[in-house]
Amino acid sequence: MFSFRSPPFPRNSHSSPPLKPLLCLSLSLSLSLSLAHTPAHPPLLFPSIVPMDPSSADVVAHDFPPFFKVYKDGRVERYKMFNNDGPSPAGDDPATGVRSKDIVILPDTGVSARIWLPRIDDCRGRKLPVLVHYHGGGFCAGSPFDPIGQRFFTTMVPKANVIAIDVDYRLGPENPLPTAHEDSSEALKWLASHSGGHGPEPWINEHADLNRVFLIGESAGANIAHYVAVRAGSTGLTGLKIVGSIIAHPFFGGKEPDKMIMFMYPGSPGTDEDPLLNPAVDPDLPKMAGERVLVCVAENDWLMPRGVKYYETLRDGPWKGEVELDEAKGEDHCFHMFKRNERAEQLLQRMADFINRE
């Protein structure tokens, strides 16, 4: 197993205490969820799997590879998805001058974040755009403290010259959906509390231009970023201005029920009939905050059709902003988070240009 948390914030580990509430759903989810699940699609974020050591004789009640399985006694165990050296510590990156630190932003729920700041010489005396990031991982994996995030932000922060906030929302299945979405929305309210330079985080007070806020997410995180933009617009959030969103390789629902989503999201059909999984059926879509959206898809990604559909929904629907589509030929799901090839660099530059466009 691998840990999803950095040492200051050990909220979710690879094996958790018994998951009593979700086991109570077994009657409503019935036989189909009681069987080991073989997904009809590849993982939402991670491209490779390191098998678990099958040393336990415990009975598995629900199995959702490559993400997690739930034992009959309610314990949750996560699959080891890739080899890494554990969480990357916050601090100064000597190669880029990018600084980072970890903070708790919602003490009542334990939601934390990692904040990234470009080289001080590049931001002294002026305010920077704010990039709020929601990581991918099927709503049940990933963390701002993983090495993946460090590689991305030490490249993206100086390239776009932004202050970035990577939100550590609570994960399923221990925290059923839409907890991840609600945590992420509350994190944006926390950011808005810095309006006027009087918030709890000095880096934001000193360096953040809250009139230039951008949301970004990949895979499940892209779903969350969209949700946060819609929620901000529909509730009239004050204290900041969302200029745009970057929706990369988004996960949205399809025609067939997604059993893992159904397990983590009680009451959801797990299909495109659910507004949380399909923006086209969300009555609040016209109120989505932001002037522009960049939708990123990859040619070899099984989710590409859903990303294109999202682009078409914004382009042809009642939302009145500007939407762009970027298709990466020959690439797969979330390649820009794992690779540093020419196409990944081009996509990150496209994102930076999108943020800094006047």
Q: What residue spans do the PLM features occupy?
A:
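Intrinsically disordered, low-complexity terminal segments enriched in Ser/Thr
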Residues: 13-18, 24-46
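Aromatic (phenylalanine/tyrosine) cluster motif
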Residues: 2-4, 9, 46
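Alpha/beta-hydrolase superfamily serine-hydrolase fold, recognizing
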Residues: 50-358
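Prokaryotic Sec-type signal peptides and long signal-anchor helices
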Residues: 6-8, 13, 239, 358
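Generic detector of solvent-exposed, compositionally biased contiguous segments
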Residues: 6, 18-19
